[in-house]
Amino acid sequence: MAKIAHDKYYTEDQLAKYCVEKTYEILGSDWDRVIEPSAGAGAYLKYLPEDTLAYDILPEADGIVVADYRQVQLPYMERSLVIGNPPFGRANKLSVQFVKASLLHSDYISLI
């Protein structure tokens, strides 16, 4: 993964594909909602449903909402999956915030 700026490390295409396939293998692929909280250049989006909700503060691909995912207010859904590669920040501070935000509306989280 190449570091760019703003604590961004872009996920390589093959790694994103593997993560999605492994998540589906373990948890299934039938979701009412899929969320990519730190979509960046869209690596995961290539392997997720078209209606995936994708967020990033500095998106670099089409279909990604410009927003800080930690501030997005989403209703809870039982069959909701959050999947992606969020920024870690110093001492994993950001990744913990992404997990906490995800737990407010989703029961299933698959982050690397």
Where are these regions (language model features)?
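Class I S-adenosyl-L-methionine-dependent methyltransferase catalytic core
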Residues: 1-112
